């Protein structure tokens, strides 16, 4: 059976991963400071970062249309779709609308839309898990069941260098934004099982916050034997150091690093790192 894995552009697959040939990326659109960025291979991350830093307003994002997803679903027997957390974006809803349209026109095609309940590194982890299962020749329903169980176990943690975009778009309370801005506090944050953002701790420096992140992972016995994905936003050296620190304290089977695309750049901003496992 032929298959493809359709992802939205917050799934930060590397160029080498895309060479597998089964991945199709459907881009979101970003608007900041009067400029529009399509989140595909043409996006210039530095231009986006500059626009965001110069703007008084939060960047806005637009999810793909149902038609964009529908176009991506064509041509195979089995379609697996991975989207941003439904709590963060309308991407999941649009992918579901496209699935219903596909069922009407091509009932013989299997389509499953997965709410990653995560973003960035978490979406990458889900997409790679689907690839592993589908390439092994498992039937569609088996791949779906295994992937749903995998999503239920995913943990996502992140530390941001700057909270400006969270402040601008209202995801931080005004008081919290003032305090963290004045003291330059670094928040150690995570995702809930439902895919919402929560605060896990704070530190005075990025190094301390990342240390808390590593300690949090090390204290979780469920991490052992898994694959960790680190997504970095314009900070490859920081990501490499984080990987080395994780390797010292944790027992992952593998740790991979991926660069942030446009949507992750909006969420994580310059210097942010996201870890999923």
Model-derived regions: residue spans:
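Generic beta-sheet signal
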Residues: 3, 79-81, 226-228
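N-terminal glycine-rich anion-binding loop in soluble enzyme alpha/beta folds
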Residues: 3-62
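Short beta-strand/turn micro-motifs composed of small residues
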Residues: 7, 83, 232
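N-terminal/domain-start segments enriched in small and hydrophobic, helix-friendly residues
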Residues: 10, 48-56, 63-69, 74-77, ...
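Mixed-charge interfacial surface used for oligomerization/domain docking
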Residues: 10-24, 28-29, 88-91, 95-100, ...
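Conserved phosphate-coordination/catalytic loops
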Residues: 60-67, 204-208
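Active-site cofactor/cluster-binding pocket
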Residues: 64-104
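A glycine-rich beta-strand to alpha-helix segment
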Residues: 83, 112-113
